[in-house]
Amino acid sequence: MMNRIHAVILDWAGTTVDFGSFAPTQIFVEAFRQAFDVEITLAEARVPMGLGKWQHIEALGKLPAVDARWQAKFGRSMSAADIDAIYAAFMPLQIAKVVDFSSPIAGVIDTIAALRAEGIKIGSCSGYPRAVMERLVPAAAEHGYRPDHWVATDDLAAGGRPGPWMALQNVIALGIDAVAHCVKVDDAALGISEGLNAGMWTVGLAVSGNEFGATWDAYQTMSKEDVAVRREHAASKLYAAGAHYVVDSLADLSGVIAHINARLAQGERP
């Protein structure tokens, strides 16, 4: 029984809650507008997803199109003080609204129950800072999602993604004996990098999250052709980041775990 998966470490928005990862992306658009009356698109807001939120704003400012808009308005590129101001606008908006995006994605509760029935522990980490997570975690618990541990992007002095530290903090907290017995699941490329840097198996989610970028209602009414195109776009980004597996959503994870267990039994490692 030792040579098998002992823990999965799950992202939050777009992986376990908030189908399409809209809570953070919409707030970035609002924060840029509120702080400096600068417009960014939802697609631009999605590009650096997975970073801590201050670093996410910094990365947005470096996108060529956003930098061009900033230069046109202010005659210079975004400064650290500008990032601080946008972050200061972002935080209260995100804290106020994250609870509205706390419902588990379809299949999450059943999948977690199935994993726990196999003795698998449930860790989690997020690009959200602790102030946001302290609102999101209890709200998700009210809907039935309660991981065994969670780590926020600003909890650790070493930093957040794409570094391995949040994933490894879960390993420590959960008492897992080997990182090769862990699976990191994420809907964003940086979360896949995090898992790889931590020495874990990685599973990307192509439909439920940031790269697919649709609401649940929009997904339900989308044509098969549109779904296929968007799925392929998302999957290609996740595979390019190094994901060992890519599936649509967490509802598909149990079969992947069985496949990884078979590989572990044959002596394979991530």
From Swiss-Prot:
Cofactor binding annotation: Binds 1 Mg(2+) ion per subunit.
Keyword hit for Magnesium: yes
Coiled-coil spans in chain: none
Broad class of enzyme this protein falls into: hydrolase
InterPro entries membership: HAD-like_hydrolase_sf (IPR050155), HAD-like_sf (IPR036412), HAD-SF_hydro_IA (IPR006439), HAD_sf (IPR023214), PGP-like_dom2 (IPR023198), Phosphonoacetald_hydro (IPR006323)
Protein keywords: Hydrolase, Magnesium, Metal-binding, Schiff base
Residue positions of the active site: 11 (nucleophile), 53 (schiff-base intermediate with substrate)
TM ranges: none
GO CC annotation: cytosol
Binding site for Mg(2+): 11, 13, 187
Catalysis: reaction(s): phosphonoacetaldehyde + H2O = acetaldehyde + phosphate + H(+)
Cofactor field: Mg(2+)
This protein's record includes keyword Magnesium: yes
Enzyme Commission code: 3.11.1.1
Gene3D superfamilies (UniProt xref): HAD superfamily/HAD-like, Putative phosphatase, domain 2
A Gene Ontology molecular function term of the record: phosphonoacetaldehyde hydrolase activity
Family: Belongs to the HAD-like hydrolase superfamily. PhnX family.
Summary of the function given for this chain in its UniProt record: Involved in phosphonate degradation.
PANTHER family per UniProt: PHOSPHOGLYCOLATE PHOSPHATASE (PTHR43434), PHOSPHONOACETALDEHYDE HYDROLASE (PTHR43434:SF19)
Subunit structure: Homodimer.
Protein's UniProt name: Phosphonoacetaldehyde hydrolase
